[in-house]
Structures are given as C-alpha cells and as structure tokens.
C-alpha cells in the first residue's frame, strides 16, 4: 500500500544519508582534514 511505499522511500533516503556521511567521514580522515 501507500504506507509501505512511503516507508520504502524513507529507508532509501535514510540509507543514502548514512552512506553519504560515512563516505564524507572516511574521505576527510584519509585526507586528514577532519
């Protein structure tokens, strides 16, 4: 249903956000710019 679709989209968006921040943290640590 609609609720399930909303939950799926939310999970996708949240997952992307987490991945993005992990990547940002990793790259700043590697370059020593944290």
Swiss-Prot record:
GO terms for cellular component: extracellular region. Disulfide bonds join 28-34. InterPro entries: Antimicrobial_frog_2. Pfam families: Antimicrobial_2. Keywords: Amphibian defense peptide, Antibiotic, Antimicrobial, Cytolysis, Disulfide bond, Hemolysis, Secreted. Expressed by the skin glands. It is found in: Secreted. GO terms for biological process: defense response to bacterium; killing of cells of another organism. The keyword Disulfide bond applies. Shows antibacterial activity against representative Gram-negative and Gram-positive bacterial species, and hemolytic activity. Belongs to the frog skin active peptide (FSAP) family. Brevinin subfamily. This is Brevinin-2Ec.
